[in-house]
């Protein structure tokens, strides 16, 4: 039915020289192993190398960590290099180990902070790879103390804020001694504000613990931040009647305003940074 086209009916002779496969040597950085690129984001020699490369990718977002803290987190990941944690999605193990290690040092991230600095973790909708599920799996595999990441203990979340506004001359890893008074004050305000909401039956019980904590912390942070901007603009002072045992260190906040602003702006970029006008108006009643 079909006739061959003469112009395309070509023949060619190809001569190959003698090649001894055993005598060939791979180029530098050439990997002799096969890695399916559909399953590995970073094609590397081992899963351990892949985790470290992933950690470097994620940690660059935590701009407020110094080189000693970053080195410490790499050592923590290196300590579990022979442990198989997940069959797939190996790169996601590194940021979870970092989060749990930072939490062991007294600093945790709210949902908004997680979205700001680890959006891949926050936006994971798979039931198997959801945040709480992954935390539980890694705690079990690595022998960490088992427990929920988000609990009604506000100090660790404000400790992360303190990390972000630290003085450049801080000594020691995850050292926030100079900012400890701020952590105590913000925590006290949040505890009392939470109790006020409980008594008024304003807490949304259908929401998760992480969501409730996120709402409380965001409301306190943005309220204090906006009051601080007014104080700086008008060269005045402000107090909060909920901070009974630990007054707000206004001078510290003024001195670190640039760092505080940078941190708040990172949170504002997220979709989870939503402030209830009712909650904010209620909290503002206690500021003078």
From Swiss-Prot:
It holds the Pfam family Pox_A8. Induction: Expressed in the early phase of the viral replicative cycle. The keyword Transcription regulation applies. InterPro entries: Pox_A8. Keywords: Activator, Early protein, Transcription, Transcription regulation. Belongs to the orthopoxvirus OPG134 family. Acts with RNA polymerase to initiate transcription from intermediate gene promoters. Heterodimer of a 45 kDa (A23R) and a 32 kDa (A8R) subunit to form the virus intermediate transcription factor (VITF)-3. This is Intermediate transcription factor 3 small subunit. The gene is OPG134.
